[in-house]
Amino acid sequence: MEHYSLAQLSKALHNREFSSVELTQHCINKIQSNKDLNAFISLDEDQALKEAQSADLVLKNGEGKPLTGIPMALKDLFCTKRLNTTCASKMLANFQAPYDATIVTKFKQNGAIIIGKTNMDEFAMGSSNENSYFGSVKNPWDRERVPGGSSGGSAAAVAGNLVPFAIGSDTGGSIRQPAAFCGISGIKPTYGLVSRYGMVAFASSLDQAGPFAKSAEDLAMILHCIAGFDSKDSTSVDRVIPDYSAEIKKPVDKIRIGLPSCFFQPQVEKGIQDAIHNAVKLFENLGAEIIEIDLKLQPFWVPCYYVIACAEASSNLSRYDGIRFGHRSKSASTLIELITNSRSEGFGNEVKRRILTGTHVLSSGFFDAYYLHAQKVRRLIRDELITTLNSVDVILGPTTPTTAFKLGEKINDPIQNYLADVFTVAANLAGLPAISIPTGFENKLPIGLQLMGKHFSESRLLAIAHHYQQHTNWHLANPNKQG
């Protein structure tokens, strides 16, 4: 059952081929036998099995929804009343939220079973999942390599067949990059499509929640469940949500694909370039029109992103002072010492680095030169991408410049870590939807292909990705049967 698609799982549960209790217990067993992946921070086994029993009764009465009785995992930055919400930080190691995030409520309403919460880079800051208070996550394809970040635990849980699907967040590539490294599918929706209420903020103008699964077909099922307006989120967009599962089954009209030359630079591994070119050839054979495009502002994507992201992070994380909530230092005799020591002890090195960077670019004398300038460049990047997408359906390229790197290889080189996001940050800066799907292997390590589309073009993106996956088998590869 672990190799079933979500649609197959849903059908099997509704047909009573096996029970939700059996499926949930199977996932719990898989998690327990793969503890070395370190994909989970917390498990809720007893409650999950109770909910599975309830789901079986609902299914028996023929009242189930598509996700009823299906176990899932949640990145540990979504607030949950039952389980701690740690953000993989000492600062919040014992924090229990008084409410559920909107996305959690939606899954409960749709009958999905939250089996546990996954490991991540601390406060979602990182591209390797090595910046966690609870230890590094390992890649199911090679346990000596990173799964990507910051949603590495969610990606590893799906790739390792521990759960059928999981939820992550994407601020600069934190869904798409781990999806690429772990050989699965992941989508960052348009900014405002999925509620951020109850999702602990890293950079509020960039953060967006989204799903991991094996295929675009599975992603469509999940996205239909979580998309939609939420009055509790001031950035939520009120618009009609299509039935993504139905949309991807419609015939795909002629596809116009934009192919940027800047995505094929020397620092992009040759195996990745070859895999992307092979994908382009397949699309051509399927009738797509390939259009060469020039993204002149691509060299500014990463520096612009890190100025804005760090600035917003320094502001968002200023609330953790050890007084209202968060880690409280025991070695302080004054208020200033309490705040200083609590933050010094509670935050890890990468989070401190980004807070300091953000504080610097927002400080007097540097605000205009860095932050304001970055916001102007952000607008130019957004305009260039929107103009380009007026002439093509999608922009296609590699999700990452390399395959998964070894644990510890880049941990002391933040610049190299930041450059892992070189192809993904633009979608966040512009608020565009983007999806990563598997497209091959290099030295037995997965390669990801990224498709970026217009605002609220998730139906088209998912349809094109599904069209590709109907003609390839990369998304069916399994770490136990390496490609």
UniProtKB/Swiss-Prot annotation:
Q: Does the keyword Phosphoprotein apply?
A: no
Give the protein's recorded name. Glutamyl-tRNA(Gln) amidotransferase subunit A
Ranges annotated as spanning the membrane? none
What is this protein for, i.e. what is its function? Allows the formation of correctly charged Gln-tRNA(Gln) through the transamidation of misacylated Glu-tRNA(Gln) in organisms which lack glutaminyl-tRNA synthetase. The reaction takes place in the presence of glutamine and ATP through an activated gamma-phospho-Glu-tRNA(Gln).
**According to its UniProt record, which residues of this chain constitute the active site?**
K75 (charge relay system), S150 (charge relay system), S174 (acyl-ester intermediate)
Q: Which Pfam families match?
A: Amidase (PF01425)
UniProt xrefs under PANTHER family: GLUTAMYL-TRNA(GLN) AMIDOTRANSFERASE SUBUNIT A, TRANSAMIDASE
What HAMAP family does this protein map onto?
GatA
